């Protein structure tokens, strides 16, 4: 019974003997407490914890036995382990400096329980309580990096990218010191996700694209990273950085396997995209990517409007706001506002004549335009040749040989 355990502990605390003998006797009591079930087990373990944090018990024995106690936590039912962990943390608090290592183990296990229950915020907050930088114990770099990444990931699951960013920034200070390649990958994935959640889409796309080339990452996960890179690029604000990223992805043959390749192709080739062409792509987006902007439009709508405006600037020398609004499928006033913002931010070349209600686009140089069109044509021809060679390899070989012999 639990009361018997409590009595044995009281007697042992008042007895004398060597540390080794006393530790052995306390360990026997712990084993006995673990044999109980349900409420009896809970009460017996609480009694054991109270004895271990009592100042009458040698600190050497307390630390040793609490370490053993922590090792048994994963074997307990989650509901009992959860109560025991909270009880232990509360009782240890006045002497927390003496038991930093044991507290860290308890918090790690408690966070695992909360994570199983999908209580992301409590799991994160439990880990935050580990004094990684301020405690007396010196934690190794990998342990600190792993813990910060866990906290950031848990806050992301709880839809709190602000807190996640705070902890990924702490991880950033450590990641160069770690030689653990797996942790480095976890850091890159987590950092890309934070940028994605924070709507820093072009930076997120660059990180995801980098991950898609890492040989240590499984092939299916590399393709998943590439998909996220493509989605983030499409959602990014129009401009030179996005254009470069579109070019990188368009030239990556793996993108042809992705469902959003059609949108990528239209964007890279500066084609106008209509609203009805976006429904399938919109369904692929994650919840945070479907959020609305300050003017009430979705992130995707805003990105496509900016893309279409940039495409229009390459088709027209100038256009009235009425015509521009009709082309972009938005009110003229909104078209003017977006055009003005893009010109001001240097993402589009041109100027606005508000008296006549016209936006003038900077004259395009014909040579770069021709170069891009020729490049696009060559790319399409190359794709056709590859498909022909896959379907009829013998005919292709004969045709190439005949061409070479001329």
UniProtKB/Swiss-Prot annotation:
Annotated Gene Ontology cellular component terms: COP9 signalosome; synaptic vesicle
Family designation: Belongs to the CSN4 family.
Top-level division of the source organism's lineage: Eukaryota
Positions of the PCI domain: 197-366
Function description: Component of the COP9 signalosome complex (CSN), a complex involved in various cellular and developmental processes. The CSN complex is an essential regulator of the ubiquitin (Ubl) conjugation pathway by mediating the deneddylation of the cullin subunits of E3 ligase complexes, leading to modify the Ubl ligase activity.
Native source organism of the sequence: Danio rerio
Cellular localisation: Cytoplasm; Nucleus; Cytoplasmic vesicle, Secretory vesicle, Synaptic vesicle
Pfam families the record matches: CSN4_RPN5_eIF3a, PCI, PSMD12-CSN4_N
InterPro entries, alphabetized: CSN4_HTH (IPR041406), PCI_dom (IPR000717), PSMD12-CSN4-like_N (IPR054559), PSMD12/CSN4 (IPR040134), TPR-like_helical_dom_sf (IPR011990), WH-like_DNA-bd_sf (IPR036388), WH_DNA-bd_sf (IPR036390)
Taxonomic placement: Eukaryota, Metazoa, Chordata, Craniata, Vertebrata
Binding partners and assembly: Component of the CSN complex, probably composed of cops1, cops2, cops3, cops4, cops5, cops6, cops7, cops8 and cops9.
Keyword Nucleus part of the UniProt annotation: yes
This protein's UniProt keywords: Cytoplasm, Cytoplasmic vesicle, Nucleus, Signalosome, Synapse
Protein name, entry field: COP9 signalosome complex subunit 4
Bilayer-crossing regions: none
PROSITE patterns: PCI (PS50250)
UniProt keyword Cytoplasm present: yes
């Amino acid at each position: 019974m639990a009361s018997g355990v409590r009595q044995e502990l009281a007697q042992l605390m008042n007895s004398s003997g060597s540390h080794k003998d006393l530790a052995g006797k306390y360990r026997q009591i712990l084993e006995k407490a673990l044999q109980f079930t349900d409420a009896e087990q809970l009460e017996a373990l609480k009694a054991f914890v109270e004895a271990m944090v009592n100042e009458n018990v040698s600190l050497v024995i307390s630390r040793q036995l609490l370490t053993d106690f922590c090792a048994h936590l994963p074997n307990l039912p989650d509901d009992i382990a959860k109560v025991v962990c909270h009880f232990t943390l509360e009782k240890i608090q006045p002497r927390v400096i003496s038991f930093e290592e044991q507290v860290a183990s308890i918090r790690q296990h408690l966070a695992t329980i909360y994570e199983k229950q999908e209580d992301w915020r409590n799991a994160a907050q439990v880990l935050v309580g580990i004094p990684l930088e301020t405690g007396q114990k010196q934690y190794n770099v990998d342990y600190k990096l792993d813990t910060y990444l866990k906290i950031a990931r848990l806050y992301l699951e709880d839809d709190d990218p602000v807190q996640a960013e705070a902890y990924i920034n702490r991880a950033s200070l450590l990641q160069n010191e770690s030689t653990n390649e797996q942790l480095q990958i976890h850091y890159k994935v987590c950092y890309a996700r934070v940028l994605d959640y924070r709507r820093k889409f072009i930076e997120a796309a660059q990180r995801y694209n980098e991950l898609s080339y890492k040989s240590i990452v499984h092939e299916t996960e590399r393709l998943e990273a590439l998909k996220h890179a493509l989605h983030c690029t499409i959602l990014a604000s129009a401009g030179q950085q996005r254009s470069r990223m579109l070019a990188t992805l368009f030239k990556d043959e793996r993108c042809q396997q992705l469902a959003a390749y059609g949108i990528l192709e239209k964007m890279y080739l500066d084609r106008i995209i209509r609203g009805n062409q976006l429904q399938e792509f919109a369904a692929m987006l994650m919840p945070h990517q479907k959020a609305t902007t300050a003017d009430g439009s979705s992130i995707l709508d805003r990105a496509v409007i900016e893309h279409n405006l940039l495409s229009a600037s390459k088709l027209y020398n100038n256009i009235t706001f009425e015509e521009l609004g009709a082309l972009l499928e938005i009110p003229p006033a909104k078209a003017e506002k977006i055009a003005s913002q893009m010109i001001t931010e240097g993402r589009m070349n041109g100027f606005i004549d508000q008296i006549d209600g016209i936006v003038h686009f900077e004259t395009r140089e014909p040579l770069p335009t021709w170069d891009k069109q020729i490049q696009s044509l060559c790319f399409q021809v190359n794709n056709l040749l590859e498909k022909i060679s896959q379907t009829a390899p013998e005919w292709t070989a004969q045709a190439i040989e005949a061409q070479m012999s001329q």
